[in-house]
Amino acid sequence: MARLGLCGGQGSIGESGLIAMAVVSFADPLTERLVAFVRSVGIEVRATTLPDKTFLPGLDIRNGAILVDEERLTHPGDILHEAGHLAVADPAERLAPKLSPDGGDELTSIAWSYAALRHLDLDPAIVFHDRGYKGGAAALIENFAAGNYVGVPLLQVYGMAAEPKRAAASGVEPYPHMLRWLR
């Protein structure tokens, strides 16, 4: 299949691994809202049919884009978590065929996801649902609500957010406010 279409299209993956696409919206309003936000920060999202099983149902990251199979997507909030992986990735690695985040990137993408939820004024359970985070979603929600943020030190190192002391010294809003959404 030839690669067609624009950012945000729908398509299917052919034998060559290329994606044929046409521009469409998502049927689920929450999915559409999350995708619109992710695109607004500069991350490409494509609606497609994923032929293979993926780590998160209905989602994959390829070549710097999030692929969403809405028929197989079980938790729309996972879109924000996957976007977090791309957002905090080293820009030189972001467009790799397959992204390989390390442990620090996982924590940082969790922090990025929470900041996105707060920015969108959404319930944290949308991302931190009971089927994710190895049973630790409730603890993440509780810790974030108490101001105990994981992953924020790396967001600060990347210049994406500031912890309270640095924010006060710099005259900027502290995390969960983001100074920028992409590393």
Set out the residue ranges of the language-model regions:
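Sequence termini and other peripheral, non-core segments
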Residues: 2-6, 11-13, 18, 150, ...
